[in-house]
């Protein structure tokens, strides 16, 4: 069985703490509230001042040290994947019309460049939507083969897909690069709360008889990254 090839990411890493100036406030949110649009930020130790123009819309899940703004503390596991799933599970019945899931910093990977203008993988304004059918992401279609594994993980992509979707894995859908996406409540509700709970339980489950390492958490996050958009598409 093949192992996951990091070259599939087509990624050139640059410093994670690259500073991003505050994004401009988008007119589409004038007279809107957090019930219409919620920005969910998974922070570790990043400077999230890029979101300062959206303070009234943001919810910060903080896995790092203390901060001087409102934030919900979380254990540092699962990267963005567990944060997304926890938010969906906890707010399933009270989700905003559109939820924008993102990391605590931007543009530290060359395949996930988001800007207000100019060459990039996606424009910032694309994500700031309140339409009830919103589904915005950086599209990729280079899914791993059914027998591939992410790094040295014990399950293949085919096995993990079967675990969640209860059918054979077919490489016929897109995935959302970086798990950065704006998703309508309707798209999220295309799956049951129990479906997302099963994903989170898998991320947090013991590995080889013990607590998962950060490497295992991040590796499981790669599987979720490949499949979460597919879940939102029903």
Please name every model-derived segment.
Residues 2-234:
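ER/Golgi luminal nucleotide-sugar-dependent glycosyltransferases, focusing on the catalytic module
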